[in-house]
């Protein structure tokens, strides 16, 4: 998992509430357990004019140009703005996989579904909670936003906002540690335990 550093990006304003995981990545694309390759089907039913299936050549599919992800001014955006209860529905981890594979590094919303919120951290995405009044301000922005995880701050052209985050989750994002990476930090301790254990119980 890549280390999360301070970055600046435009933000995509997807002004919808209660976006569930099936809207984020439809169920027909969940057959793979690899983390990569889901970005092209992110928000598939809104992004394309036809019905998507596994194996289709997405470059030849008709785009819905009214959908924000397809608009030229938002290409390359790393920040997603949404309304409340983002990531509700089934607890598929493919949803943050698709968001991360598309290129999103942070999602800002008034609230998130609990399991989705936890899965974001495990996949290197920073979910930021801001109240509705602040979200109203963000949705009117036309410039770039800078996110500084170390300072827990969001900077626009005119204002600075702050957000809360669990200190351990913050540490893991800053250091690029997923569950496996966190475990590997204790490799020497694990080897020492295994050696001691098998010396004591060598008949096992």
Swiss-Prot record:
Coiled coil: none annotated. Keywords: Amino-acid biosynthesis, Branched-chain amino acid biosynthesis, Leucine biosynthesis, Lyase. The keyword DNA damage does not apply. It comes from the Bacteria. Its EC number is 4.2.1.33. The keyword RNA-binding does not apply. InterPro entries: 3-IsopropMal_deHydase_ssu, Aconitase/3IPM_dehydase_swvl, AconitaseA/IPMdHydase_ssu_swvl, IPMI_Swivel, LeuD. GO terms for molecular function: 3-isopropylmalate dehydratase activity. It catalyses: (2R,3S)-3-isopropylmalate = (2S)-2-isopropylmalate. GO terms for cellular component: 3-isopropylmalate dehydratase complex. One of its GO terms (biological process) is L-leucine biosynthetic process. Pathway: Amino-acid biosynthesis; L-leucine biosynthesis; L-leucine from 3-methyl-2-oxobutanoate: step 2/4. Catalyzes the isomerization between 2-isopropylmalate and 3-isopropylmalate, via the formation of 2-isopropylmaleate. Heterodimer of LeuC and LeuD. Belongs to the LeuD family. LeuD type 1 subfamily. HAMAP family: LeuD_type1. This is 3-isopropylmalate dehydratase small subunit. It comes from Ruthia magnifica subsp. Calyptogena magnifica.
């Amino acid at each position: 998992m890549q280390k999360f550093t301070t970055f600046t990006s435009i933000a995509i304003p997807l002004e919808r509430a209660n976006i569930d995981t099936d809207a984020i990545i439809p169920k027909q694309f969940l057959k793979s357990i690899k983390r990569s390759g889901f970005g092209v089907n992110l928000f598939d039913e809104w992004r394309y004019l036809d019905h998507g299936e596994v194996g289709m050549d997405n470059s030849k599919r008709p785009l819905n140009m009214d959908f924000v992800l397809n608009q030229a001014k938002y290409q390359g955006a790393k920040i997603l703005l949404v309304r409340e209860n983002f990531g509700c529905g089934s607890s598929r981890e493919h949803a943050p996989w698709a968001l991360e594979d598309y290129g999103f590094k942070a999602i800002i919303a008034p609230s998130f579904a609990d399991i989705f919120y936890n899965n974001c951290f495990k996949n290197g995405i920073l979910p930021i909670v801001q109240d509705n009044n602040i979200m109203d301000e963000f949705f009117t922005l036309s410039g770039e936003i800078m996110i500084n995880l170390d300072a827990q701050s969001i900077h626009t052209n005119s204002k600075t906002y702050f957000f809360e985050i669990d200190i351990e989750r913050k540490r893991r994002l800053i250091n690029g540690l997923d569950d496996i990476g966190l475990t590997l930090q204790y490799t020497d301790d694990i080897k020492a335990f295994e050696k001691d254990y098998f010396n004591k119980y060598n008949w096992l």
